[in-house]
């Protein structure tokens, strides 16, 4: 702890950019490295989950990411469930962002588009298209709307439910209505639930005790796109937050006699090096935003915005352009080949090589790699 004033202390924490991996074992061939992981009954070949935003995930994007071994999470409260012509609406939004550099213009339009009511038929149709393609189907809902939307999603045939907000606790208390008790909610479902975000050890442990199959660390913090620090004074030191959640996972594993809850890191991961460091800190998988937004398959056409940017009264994000001109395919973003020397393409290839250089063959073992603070 560091004293920041008389009688007030704060904890020293670390960002991913402040740490480095330290190889200390025999190196291996990257061809011998496995990046596979399993969430409940569902196996994925790469530890990559798409952040649930309309800037990324359409049914087509989710299908392609699933085909490549990852998981695309549809935003159940986004534009896809509100507008039949979602492509035209997104194009309108991008046009506004390109014409007017002031972020408020595009955010205002985004709020207007989200003011349209959710259409269960549109949402169910989008889910069905993903399911029919044979890939794992996951949809995100907020804690506030989880009880209302989940029956619609279950009827459409989802495999995984993601209950996600900027900050999620085991119980969401509301004086004006019935609180959401995640433990009760999850126990009544037949599908696995991933919940988050959390920023600390205690909240992560509490979420694990609800029966969640996975816990999301962070809220998708993205330079130039998310503004939770400016609006709420809340930010996430991802290296520390991931390590704390991993410690909660170990504690819960001992507490239950072997139940393993997966940790998903969501925020401040832009390159393959940061992806590798997130895994090294204890994450089982990462949730990516801007790295995937540059792909040709992303719905946002090279633009990214978080779901919180559409909040009707307190937006906590803006539109950010991530790619100009010809955009790489999702295959190239994830698996290469890359002509970019800064780690923004061939993300999984970079992770494999980092693991191989450090002498590890699988993700769980790689969580034990040595780390140093480099500040």
UniProtKB/Swiss-Prot annotation:
Highest taxon of source: Bacteria
One of the GO BP terms on file: GTP biosynthetic process
Keywords in alphabetical order: NAD, Oxidoreductase
Gene3D superfamilies reported for this sequence: Aldolase class I
Molecular function GO labels: IMP dehydrogenase activity
Broad enzyme group: oxidoreductase
SUPFAM superfamilies: Inosine monophosphate dehydrogenase (IMPDH)
EC identifiers of the protein: 1.-.-.-
InterPro entries, A to Z: Aldolase_TIM, IMP_DH, IMP_DH-rel2, IMP_DH_GMPRt
Family affiliation: Belongs to the IMPDH/GMPR family.
Name listed for the protein in its UniProt record: Uncharacterized oxidoreductase ML0388
Source organism of this protein record: Mycobacterium leprae (strain TN)
């Amino acid at each position: 702890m560091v004293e920041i004033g008389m009688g007030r202390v704060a904890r020293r924490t670390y960002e991913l950019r402040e740490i480095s991996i330290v190889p200390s074992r025999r190196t291996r061939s990257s061809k011998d490295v496995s990046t596979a992981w399993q969430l409940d009954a569902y196996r994925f070949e790469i530890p990559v989950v798409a952040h649930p935003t309309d800037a990324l995930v359409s049914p087509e994007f989710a299908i392609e990411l699933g085909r490549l071994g990852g998981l695309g999470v549809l935003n159940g409260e986004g534009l896809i469930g509100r507008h039949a012509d979602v492509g035209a609406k997104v194009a309108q939004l991008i046009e506004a962002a390109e014409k007017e550099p002031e972020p408020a213009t595009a955010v205002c339009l985004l709020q207007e588009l989200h003011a349209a009511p959710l259409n269960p038929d549109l949402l169910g149709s989008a889910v069905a298209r993903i399911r029919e393609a044979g890939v794992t189907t996951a949809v995100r809902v907020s804690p506030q709307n989880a009880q209302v939307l989940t029956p619609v999603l279950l009827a459409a045939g989802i495999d995984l439910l993601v209950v996600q907000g900027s900050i999620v606790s085991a119980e969401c208390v509301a004086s004006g209505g019935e609180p959401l008790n995640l433990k009760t909610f999850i126990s009544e479902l037949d599908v696995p639930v991933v919940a988050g975000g959390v920023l600390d050890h205690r909240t992560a442990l509490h979420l694990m005790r609800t029966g969640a199959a996975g816990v999301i660390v962070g809220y998708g913090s993205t330079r130039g796109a998310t503004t939770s620090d400016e609006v709420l004074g809340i930010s996430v030191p991802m290296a520390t937050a991931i390590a704390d959640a991993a410690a909660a996972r170990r504690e819960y594993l001992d507490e239950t006699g072997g139940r393993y809850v997966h940790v998903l890191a969501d925020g401040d991961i832009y390159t393959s090096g940061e992806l590798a460091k997130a895994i090294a800190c204890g994450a089982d998988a990462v949730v990516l935003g801007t790295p995937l937004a540059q792909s040709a398959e992303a719905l946002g056409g090279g633009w990214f915005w978080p779901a919180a940017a559409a909040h009707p009264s307190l937006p906590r994000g803006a539109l950010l352009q991530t790619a100009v001109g010809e955009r790489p395919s999702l295959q190239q973003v994830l698996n290469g080949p890359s002509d970019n020397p800064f780690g923004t393409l061939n993300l999984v290839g970079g992770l494999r090589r980092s693991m191989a250089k450090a002498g590890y063959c699988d993700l769980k073992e790689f969580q034990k790699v040595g780390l140093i603070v480099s500040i």
